[in-house]
């Protein structure tokens, strides 16, 4: 009875508030094919909904978070918006997001990769539905590598053989001082960013071992250049001077003119038997707590994430979608399949509000330990000290 009454209240509330806003407002930061695919999906929603209209507003990604944080409390923000999950903790704590407990159920949740749903949970409440995901995988040059390595030992052996045959070529490259790119090894050695007690764990033994591993690849195995930039990685790989690259799906857009490459899940860390596990970033579709049309907003969210729409975004928008049923085994391309496999071994990037404190100290620690000879334990202990201090 209470549920029926609540739905009746929502319907009445929606009907009254439509006088104040005659259309749903959806904010996004998509461009190109992704924006086109979203627009088409929204028009299909309008055609299927009873008189519901949606106004799409494109907001530059760099300004999105700040603009949203100001607009929602003032009552002039969107009803629904699409954004990366890492700000959910901050926005939920400030009361900007509507939790989906009223609507979400097990059959709905089971549509998606579990890790993508976990990314949208903060303090046991679900705050959005997952649209798409991004993570890292292993790109390799097929003119240099016949078969993707299953373990890090195999990867190192292949890389060393390539270097021995031609010293102008390198085995592996990625931004060495980036925690985002180091995360596969951190997790593969059994480490984590925060402990279960919510304490920074970057100075724990597994984290120290992961940094020592990277330093060995640079200075002892000599398969990674000492100075690595994103531009250098792209240049070396396109010139076929690089065997392996740790990178995300966006890297494909930089490989025009190079068609002899492939991508595979990251290897198992030989020292631990644990797969290298990259961070997982999720683009969720979220509902504003200040929306005057929550029921209609949620209907739009459900529509955008359903299987047929996910298949369309996967094929025409080029997105790695979170809906599992959109992937037909054996029917997709190898690129998509590699990232579909990788998501199952990915670690959701923390959505804690204080996660943002960790990036700069971690970057400094990785730089000091890998490129400047500071002992890994010492560099990571300093990072933890700065994180706890709030620097």
Region spans (language model):
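Conserved N-terminal structural module of periplasmic/extracytoplasmic solute-binding proteins
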Residues: 3, 10-90, 270-273, 312, ...
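Short helix-initiation/N-cap motifs at beta->coil->alpha
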Residues: 58-67, 86, 152-154, 225-239
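Hinge/lid segment of periplasmic solute-binding proteins
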Residues: 83-137, 152-158, 184, 262-265, ...
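Short, solvent-exposed loop/beta-turn-alpha elements that line the ligand-binding surface or hinge
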Residues: 101-112, 191-210, 268-278, 328-329, ...
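Extracytoplasmic/periplasmic solute-binding protein
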Residues: 127-131, 136, 154-200, 206, ...
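Glycine-centered hinge/linker elements that transmit conformational signals in sensory
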Residues: 158-159, 198-227, 257, 266
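Extracytoplasmic/periplasmic substrate-recognition and gating elements
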Residues: 216-225, 256-319, 347, 364, ...
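Long, aromatic- and glycine/proline-rich binding clefts that accommodate carbohydrate-like moieties
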Residues: 264, 314-364, 368
């Amino acid at each position: 009875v209470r549920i029926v009454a609540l739905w009746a209240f929502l319907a009445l509330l929606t009907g009254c508030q439509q006088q104040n806003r005659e259309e749903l407002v959806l904010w996004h930061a998509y461009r190109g094919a992704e924006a086109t695919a979203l627009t088409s999906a929204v028009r299909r929603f309008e055609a299927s909904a009873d008189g519901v209209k949606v106004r799409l507003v494109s907001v530059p990604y760099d300004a999105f978070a700040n603009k949203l944080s100001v607009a929602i409390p003032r009552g002039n923000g969107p009803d629904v918006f699409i954004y990366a999950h890492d700000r959910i903790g901050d926005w939920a704590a400030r009361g900007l997001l509507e939790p989906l407990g009223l609507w979400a159920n097990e059959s709905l949740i089971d549509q998606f990769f579990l890790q993508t749903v976990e990314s949208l949970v903060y303090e046991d409440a679900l705050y959005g539905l997952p649209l798409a995901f991004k993570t890292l995988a292993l790109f390799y040059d097929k003119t240099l590598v016949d078969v993707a390595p299953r373990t890090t030992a195999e990867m190192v052996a292949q890389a060393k053989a390539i270097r021995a045959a031609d010293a102008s070529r390198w085995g592996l490259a990625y931004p060495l001082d980036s925690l985002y790119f180091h995360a596969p090894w951190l997790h593969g050695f059994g480490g984590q960013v925060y402990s279960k007690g919510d304490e920074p764990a970057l100075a724990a033994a597994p984290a120290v071992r992961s940094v020592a591993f990277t330093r060995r690849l640079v200075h002892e195995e000599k398969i990674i250049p000492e100075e690595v930039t994103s531009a250098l990685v792209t240049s070396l790989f396109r010139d076929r001077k690089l065997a392996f690259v740790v990178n995300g799906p966006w890297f494909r857009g930089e490989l025009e003119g190079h068609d002899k490459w492939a991508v595979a899940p990251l290897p198992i860390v030989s020292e631990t038997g644990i797969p290298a596990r990259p961070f997982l970033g999720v683009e969720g579709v979220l509902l504003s707590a200040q929306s005057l049309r929550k029921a209609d907003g949620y209907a739009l969210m459900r529509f955008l994430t359903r299987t047929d729409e996910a298949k369309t975004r996967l094929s025409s928008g080029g997105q790695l979608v979170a809906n599992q049923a959109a992937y037909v085994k054996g029917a997709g391309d190898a690129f998509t399949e590699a990232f579909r496999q990788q998501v199952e071994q990915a670690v959701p990037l923390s959505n804690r509000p204080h996660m943002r404190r960790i990036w700069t100290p971690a970057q400094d620690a990785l730089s000091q330990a890998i490129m400047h000879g500071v002992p890994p334990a010492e560099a990571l202990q300093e990072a933890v000290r700065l994180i706890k201090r709030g620097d």
